[in-house]
Amino acid sequence: MIDSIRSSRALIDVRRLGTVDYRAAWQQQRDLADARVAGGPDTLLLLQHPAVYTAGRRTEPHERPLDGTPVVDTDRGGKITWHGPGQLVGYPIIGLAEPLDVVDYVRRLEEALIKVCADLGLDTVRVPGRSGVWVPGDAGRPDRKVAAIGVRVSRATTLHGFALNCDCDLGAFSAIVPCGISDAGVTSLTAELRRPVAVDDVVTSVADLVCDALDGVLPVREHSPGARVASAM
């Protein structure tokens, strides 16, 4: 049985926007959310941002850049992160079906990105208690986040979304405590696969799989580190 999380059966309007200033994209999200509440379509924005730090509602003062670099405070969940060139950002503006299940929504975004990584040859997992998509730690290296997720739901409509590190500058994360997690690392598809993986290489797959996950065509499965070990035995 296909189990969509969306309240609409119409196709999602996927828009590839190139590079967009963060504040401009945030305003576009709010405009689209207003339109969705008024009966407009579900929309998925796919884009990159010029380099910027953004802080979710739970960001602590000590997690901000120590050098005073400006930070855009947002109304999404989560803590501080970085966006910039080489990172694919997705903002689904989706009307959720009742009863609302935000955890299920986040799991569906994770499922899509886990499948994107798997199709490229990268094994990724969920980490209990932490959102996003992770490369499990090994050989003395910690778990490493390759995709971050931070969302907001208002009037049964989603805003903000996910960021998949493709070939971005990982050094930008060194000035902050990414997502408030000090005992794990940040990585990219390029770093893990040891070959160039650009945003353009994954944007079509991300668009298709996010839509499939939200519509229930791609079901949510178990991807914990424990399940990974068990399946390898």
From Swiss-Prot:
What is its pathway?
Protein modification; protein lipoylation via endogenous pathway; protein N(6)-(lipoyl)lysine from octanoyl-[acyl-carrier-protein]: step 1/2
Q: What is its EC number?
A: 2.3.1.181
Protein known as: Octanoyltransferase
Gene3D superfamilies, alphabetized: Bira Bifunctional Protein, Domain 2
Give the positions of the site Lowers pKa of active site Cys: 145
Which positions are catalytic residues? 179 (acyl-thioester intermediate)
EC top class, in one word?
transferase
What reactions does this protein catalyze? octanoyl-[ACP] + L-lysyl-[protein] = N(6)-octanoyl-L-lysyl-[protein] + holo-[ACP] + H(+)
Location within or outside the cell: Cytoplasm
User: Under the GO molecular function aspect, what terms does this record hold?
Assistant: lipoyl(octanoyl) transferase activity
UniProt entry tagged with the keyword 4Fe-4S = no
**BPL/LPL catalytic domain ranges (all copies):** 38-218
GO biological process terms held by the UniProt record: protein modification process
